[in-house]
Structures are given as structure tokens and as C-alpha cells.
Amino acid sequence: MMTTLTARPEAITFDPQQSAQIVVDMQNAYATPGGYLDLAGFDVSTTRPVIANIQTAVTAARAAGMLIIWFQNGWDEQYVEAGGPGSPNFHKSNALKTMRKQPQLQGKLLAKGSWDYQLVDELVPQPGDIVLPKPRYSGFFNTPLDSILRSRGIRHLVFTGIATNVCVESTLRDGFFLEHFGVVLEDATHQAGPEFAQKAALFNIETFFGWVSDVETFCDALSPTSFARIA
């Protein structure tokens, strides 16, 4: 059953049962003091409301029959998957750079099985959800995401998570290139860096690659009364 979500730059209509909510990298690394972003000098002091908003959005999406996909960014304990000096990721990943500057952190940041890699305690995948590891910013790179979506007839993706200007935007952009419709819930995301990075990412998304809405509006669009209005 179709519903219409009020968004910028215009409303978008979708069928929740042929849509997915993508939760990007809600790991201790990105959302918890003592995690990678915090240790690398990024401000994570305002992530708690984002976690609560994601909880709300996921609950509404699951109740409406949307597929929930959780991403965890990181690599094996030896960081082979991160790439060596021949990879730009080796030079640009702030996690890898932080560990080179602080060798005592080696093996602790974004390593699979570590506390840093784990999802935050408040966000727990449920049976029927899909949890995917990803080795780079985009959730489409070297993962089965596109085939998972296409095999289920899913074309509309609703994004939440961290960081808006890095992994969220990268995944939404790649989805756009693969003919997926991407919506980001702005109050269920958080940037890495200054506030202008959040504003710039949202501007890019709503102007060039997708749509921007918020959690309250999203939940309202999934309510039974909204389906009744469309019907």
C-alpha cells in the first residue's frame, strides 16, 4: 500500500513493503565517547538524540513492513581489508591515520570483533533484519546490498546513521547511480566534522541525489491514517 512522505524538495510516494531503511554505521566507533571518531578529534557529544530518533524510525519502519538493513564499517583484525599504501583508503581513513599516530590503538579501531566495531547498545537488530559489513564508505561497494534490494523489488531507501557527510551520503549517491530512490531523515543522522558539513551534505542530497525528511514526518507517513488517505 502506497504512502506519501513530505520531504524536500518535494514529497515522495512509496510502498513501505517494497522499501528499506538503511541504518549506517551506528557503531561505538561513530556514536560513543571513546570510540574512533572521538579519539580522532571529532565531536560525538550530540549523538544521543540521533540514536533515540533512529530507534523511533526503525520501530515505525519495521511495523510498516520495511526491510531493515544495518551496516557496520570496518575491517579484519589485521586490517588487510583496509588496503595498504597502494589504496587511497590507507591514506585518507582517519581511523587508520589515528592508529599510525597512536600505535597503542592498533587493532582497537574499527576491527571486527572489537568494542569499537559493535553497534551501540541501544540499537539491536531483530530477526528478519539484515546486518552487512562494509569495507569502505559506500554500502554498495564490495557488498551484496544491490542484489539484496533488487531480489526483493526494493527501490526506495530511507537512510539514517553516521556520518551524514561521509558514509550516509556516499551510500545514497551510489544508490542514485544504481536507480534507487534515496531519502535521508535529517534528525536521525549526524555529521563527522563541523555543523556546516551536515548542512552541505543535506543540500547536496536534496538538490542533486535524493530527498530529505525527518523522523516525525516519516513515522506519520507510515501511520494507518496516512495509508487510508492515499487509498
Swiss-Prot record:
The lineage of its organism: Bacteria, Pseudomonadati, Pseudomonadota, Gammaproteobacteria, Enterobacterales. Induction: Up-regulated by the nitrogen regulatory protein C (NtrC also called GlnG) and repressed by RutR. One of its GO terms (biological process) is uracil catabolic process. It comes from the Bacteria. This is Ureidoacrylate amidohydrolase RutB. Belongs to the isochorismatase family. RutB subfamily. The gene is rutB. Disulfide bonds: none annotated. Signal peptide: none annotated. Its EC number is 3.5.1.110. It is an enzyme of class 3 (hydrolase). It catalyses: (Z)-3-ureidoacrylate + H2O + H(+) = (Z)-3-aminoacrylate + NH4(+) + CO2; (Z)-3-ureidoacrylate + H2O = (Z)-3-aminoacrylate + carbamate + H(+); (Z)-2-methylureidoacrylate + H2O + H(+) = (Z)-2-methylaminoacrylate + NH4(+) + CO2. InterPro entries: Isochorismatase-like_dom (IPR000868), Isochorismatase-like_hydrls (IPR050272), Isochorismatase-like_sf (IPR036380), RutB (IPR019916). Hydrolyzes ureidoacrylate to form aminoacrylate and carbamate. The carbamate hydrolyzes spontaneously, thereby releasing one of the nitrogen atoms of the pyrimidine ring as ammonia and one of its carbon atoms as CO2. The active site is at residues 25, 134, 167.
